[in-house]
């Protein structure tokens, strides 16, 4: 019953949800500026302005917070990407470009988010498997956008889509860290061009007999 008590017009559940939101926001700030290794329970509590004892009501471990922050960014990418696809009329190419635009906007506009999903997750034992799973899932979306007459479930299409996703991630990382300087529209155009070049190659070789 204590969880339903009202304090300041807010229920216990509302206060727990608000504390969780503040912990996630603090995790985003620290993971995106100092790195995952430096994002500790104590540091997150201090950044959130909350007593450390509240942490356990939302997250069993600090790794669970890391995952929650990562998942929140992926959810934003997916939501914005799918909305962009739905709002774009025309060819598969135009819809794919809209999705790539949404991805670039999330990861490059807020550099904290880009650092977490593109850099920090690679070396994290907690986030690494999740990153791979999400890459495979997004590769499936890319395969479906190909517009290819080839079945998107075939091995060749899946490999090409996975290749494209990896290339997109590495390219965005290079832009994020300043290794490549390019304007937004040119970047998205090139990514889209390379995406469809890879998928065209699959169509061109579909049915080719492999000889070893």
Task: Locate predicted features.
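Amphipathic alpha-helical packing segments from all-alpha helical-bundle domains
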Residues: 125-150, 158-173, 186, 193-197
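Secondary-structure edge/capping motif, primarily at the C-terminal ends of alpha-helices
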Residues: 81-88, 117-121, 149, 175-179
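Generic hydrophobic, amphipathic alpha-helix propensity
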Residues: 16-27, 44, 69-77, 81
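Hydrophobic/aromatic residues within well-ordered alpha-helical segments
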Residues: 19, 62, 69, 73, ...
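Helix-turn-helix
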Residues: 22, 30-64, 68
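Amphipathic alpha-helical segments used for helix-helix packing
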Residues: 107-126, 143, 173
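Hydrophobic alpha-helical connector segments
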Residues: 68, 83-109
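C-terminal peripheral helix-coil segments that are non-catalytic and often amphipathic
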Residues: 1-6, 105, 140, 144-148, ...
